[in-house]
């Protein structure tokens, strides 16, 4: 089997990671003790991707939980599925990173990283044929962003030919924990551009807007935001966990989705959007699902896809539905809004259907888009970064941990390069040959 080793780092990473394991354990019929109580062979057919089968028919998640302070991991351990994880896979420090990327990446995190890598090796060795790693973390804090990116680069060194996939929560001024989020996020993106194969950009701003506008929650909590994240994560991993043809492993997904190695930041979406209480009231049709899924209000990244163009798209439909109808609707979207898909990648929309719907829904759709509009998210962080960096505000916290201002400048320019690369491919057309000839004539 093709296994995936899951890592979760920092407070946010551990909270959404724990939620992810709750949701997929439920979908695979696994209870909090690791015993199987399912009703379908499909649940077990590819269970090995995320779970290790231990003695006594117990299923143990291939998960490694990392943090620089014990708090969040204690609450995961005492949470609903806390006992399902392998106790040795909790790796934590005592000092905390204090929302400081440098502490996570260079000082505190660097001290803990070797003991994490030991656990990574142990998990990898129990795999038959490891396909890659996935990390859940946020980019605004200290541990998830600083130590998370340190782990990525260390794992990359040791397993250079395995896929590295991240679920990265982007900071937002609307749901802000700390004032230095733009610094931490920029330093992290600088690492993610170079060291990951696919990154799902989950944006607190978008999650907040969905809760507020669509779900009519007046004061969304992190619990509400994480409910959306876990639905999305369950959706994008469907193809990896259940039998199917399309994007059945991380590498195939990357091959379909990433036309240029640096442009691997995906915009996830989900339909139907429901709040935690109101799922069962009406079933959606395939046309409604498709329409909702492409709607900017359903995107988990605060970018408007209509401001850019799609390089590639993958859609995953779940539930009992007619393949024919799904294909018709997807073609319909591409024909109606063809200007939003780059014409120099033909057939750049791929669709998969899985029979098993998520808990509480008859059918759902998950959207993964590689859109040039994602640059809006990086621009937003970059502007906040520049505003503070110009005045060197809060910089002493980072230089005090041994960082150099030069590193900030490099991260800033790498992020700006990323934005202009997206812009370049947004403007590119299939008949560029003609434009160059015209320029020569003028010369």
From Swiss-Prot:
Q: Which PROSITE patterns match?
A: TUBULIN, TUBULIN_B_AUTOREG
Where does tissue-level expression of this protein occur? Nervous system specific.
According to the UniProt record, one GO cellular component term is: microtubule
- Origin: domain of life: Eukaryota
Quote one Gene Ontology molecular function term: structural constituent of cytoskeleton
Quick one: which residues bind GTP?
11, 69, 138, 142-144, 204, 226
Per the entry, what this protein does is:
Tubulin is the major constituent of microtubules, a cylinder consisting of laterally associated linear protofilaments composed of alpha- and beta-tubulin heterodimers. Microtubules grow by the addition of GTP-tubulin dimers to the microtubule end, where a stabilizing cap forms. Below the cap, tubulin dimers are in GDP-bound state, owing to GTPase activity of alpha-tubulin.
Question: This protein is called what?
Answer: Tubulin beta-2 chain
> Gene encoding it?
tubb2
